[in-house]
């Protein structure tokens, strides 16, 4: 169900009817590369620390003992969703070459690096598509789509396009390529479409972007204000 609906957060009771309890559900979610970015809150009616430790060891993001105040649950939910928003900001800042000092788990940094490496390595590969991308990442297409959507807020197609435009920005800033050269280099055949999409992503036209950042681009691939 989580793979189908792609929730922002999951709240589960430890005691559930059926063959799976909340701890097992949490384990399945956190073991799934497509879903492990989704925060999980476990609810329990017991004060048994062993059960709580088991849930935490399976990756639960928070634990709330019943009975609980509704405002407490709301506050915990808002806190976890804020973390998700910060994660998406990290991805957007990284894609648009903005410096971001916030700390995110290494697994997300590594995931983004892998995505960028694979997409940039296949800029001239006519066979590269979302299925090819998924295979290169060692994931199913649906798992990769869900993961990308969850951590970046973008569809798989939009994410790949954003990484291509990221590379174009680097080429314009470091290789002195003009807009047409850079757009063709990363696989855009329609320069007008490239300009439109670039402006949406970076908030500046390619020309204005070059003027603003060509002389303030650091070795870590960040634009400096």
Say what each PLM segment does.
Residues 78-93:
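The C-terminal output helix
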Residues 64-66:
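A Lys-centered signature of the CheY-like receiver
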Residues 130-159, 183-205:
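Basic/polar phosphate-binding segments, predominantly the helix-turn-helix DNA-binding elements
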Residues 20, 24, 31, 36, ...:
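Alpha4 helix (beta4-alpha4-beta5 surface) of REC/receiver domains from two-component response regulators
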Residues 150-189, 212-225:
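Terminal helix-turn-helix DNA-binding modules in bacterial transcription factors
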Residues 68-77, 89:
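C-terminal output helix
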Residues 5-11, 16:
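Active-site beta3 strand of CheY-like receiver
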